Curated annotation (Swiss-Prot):
Enzyme class: translocase
EC number(s) recorded for this UniProt protein: 7.1.1.9
Stretches in topological domain Mitochondrial intermembrane: 1-14, 88-227
Cofactor: Cu cation
Phylogenetic classification of the source organism: Eukaryota, Metazoa, Chordata, Craniata, Vertebrata
Protein's recorded name: Cytochrome c oxidase subunit 2
Species of provenance: Balaenoptera borealis (Sei whale)
Keywords attached to this entry: Copper, Electron transport, Magnesium, Membrane, Metal-binding, Mitochondrion, Mitochondrion inner membrane, Respiratory chain, Translocase, Transmembrane, Transmembrane helix, Transport
Amino acid sequence: MAYPFQLGFQDATSPIMEELLHFHDHTLMIVFLISSLVLYIITLMLTTKLTHTSTMDAQEVETVWTILPAIILILIALPSLRILYMMDEVNNPSLTVKTMGHQWYWSYEYTDYEDLSFDSYMIPTSDLKPGELRLLEVDNRVILPMEMTIRMLVSSEDVLHSWAVPSLGLKTDAIPGRLNQTTLMSTRPGLFYGQCSEICGSNHSFMPIVLELVPLEIFEKWSASML
């Protein structure tokens, strides 16, 4: 999860988030090299006393500064498209959970079970226990099995919302009348926090998301106790 004065991303918990971190580093290195080259050229132009005022045409230079940016853009676009298609791919999910956005809480329904659904509200600051996080804790966590492909169906009952969990690389818009889907898979157990990421009204800041990823045996015991 995030911590105060954090400069980087949250620790990756899913294969998608790991790919996004690699892509970020890849793109940042390209930007760093381009910035260094531009800074070097500017410094050279400001410090050199040599001038060349008779140059009217330079086909070679124009060819290079046309082709080189195109190659750089391709090197950025290809891995980006690969990750984009990976995020849209849904292959034989082991579990499907439907989440609906409301003003201002989330409701969840485990569609593979006959009657397993609940609402998830933020716990008010006055009711927090020692060690719990302000504006991030909820009364009902979403319990999910780790190391399994899970399909999330996301929609809204009223206005636009956005269901986002950064450490899993998830951010899916909740749109009234439309059902969006995304997949998640956690490589380790733990608590993972998110929030509504679309301005949805006066209490937009009070719509936290808490996923608790557990081993399959614990998930089965929990689901049996909820039925």
